[in-house]
Amino acid sequence: MPKTRRRPRRSQRKRPPTPWPTSQGLDRVFFSDTQSTCLETVYRATGAPSLGDYVRPVYIVTPYWPPVQSIRSPGTPSMDALSAQLYSSLSLDSPPSPPREPLRPSRSLPRRPPIQPPTFHPPSSRPCANTPPSETDTWNPPLGSTSQPCLFQTPASGPKTCTPSGEAPLSACTSTSFPPPSPGPSCPT
């Protein structure tokens, strides 16, 4: 086991003397002034406090106010009466005041149904539950357009109609029964 060096303890007598009288614990100093109506209690630490029992210095001022003469005009209720009246009106035993009637909507405006949150259904294999699945999906061209939809036959399903997309065509419509129209819309593969 290696030898441990003992550090020499610093003597606590080498510190400079404190300007106030030192004693064990705390000094309680009372300042009482006849001119002022405040009683000041000051706690201050004396000496160098150790880390174990360090008490922060506390400064406490407790003001003392002289009694004030009643300066209210005759006929006005006192603060005690007002506070008692307020306490009785706000007590829990008294019934709550009836709520005011809400503003009635005018008869000219139609009454709206209350807003309900949307309901979410689990995803199903069919796109819509109300519409029956059809083999041929039809596409109605917008007004002013004379292009015809291109129909093509796939071996898995019947004839389908391609909806035009605004993107560049990936491939031209290929069909075994109809020639591909040149100005027609493109079909995604």
From Swiss-Prot:
A motif (Nuclear export signal) lies at residues 82-93. A motif (Nuclear localization signal, and RNA-binding (RxRE)) lies at residues 2-18. Keywords: Host cytoplasm, Host nucleus, Host-virus interaction, mRNA transport, Phosphoprotein, RNA-binding, Transport. Rex escorts unspliced gag-pro-pol and singly spliced env mRNAs out of the nucleus of infected cells. These mRNAs carry a recognition sequence called Rex responsive element (RxRE or XRE) located at the 3' region of the long terminal repeat (LTR). This function is essential since most HTLV proteins are translated from unspliced or partially spliced pre-mRNAs that cannot exit the nucleus by the pathway used by fully processed cellular mRNAs. Rex itself is translated from a fully spliced mRNA that probably readily exits the nucleus. Residues 1-16 have a biased composition (Basic residues). GO terms for molecular function: RNA binding. Signal peptide: none annotated. The modification Phosphoserine is found at S70, S177. GO terms for cellular component: host cell cytoplasm; host cell nucleolus. Residues 84-94 have a biased composition (Low complexity). Induction: Down-regulated by P30II. Homomultimer. Multimeric assembly is essential for activity and involves XPO1. Binds to human XPO1 and KPNB1. Interacts (via N-terminal nuclear localization signal) with human NPM1. Residues 127-164 have a biased composition (Polar residues). Residues 56-70, 123-131 are annotated as: Homomultimerization. Residues 111-125, 178-189 have a biased composition (Pro residues). HTLV-1 lineages are divided in four clades, A (Cosmopolitan), B (Central African group), C (Melanesian group) and D (New Central African group). The lineage of its organism: Viruses, Riboviria, Pararnavirae, Artverviricota, Revtraviricetes. Residues 1-28, 84-189 are annotated as: Disordered. The RNA-binding motif binds to the RxRE, a complex secondary structure consisting of four stem loops and a long stretch of stem structure, present in incompletely spliced viral pre-mRNAs. This region also contains the NLS which mediates nuclear localization. These overlapping functions prevent Rex bound to RxRE from undesirable return to the nucleus. When Rex binds the RxRE, the NLS becomes masked while the NES remains accessible. The leucine-rich NES mediates binding to human XPO1. The modification Phosphothreonine is found at T174. GO terms for biological process: mRNA transport. Phosphorylated. This is Protein Rex. Belongs to the deltaretrovirus Rex protein family.
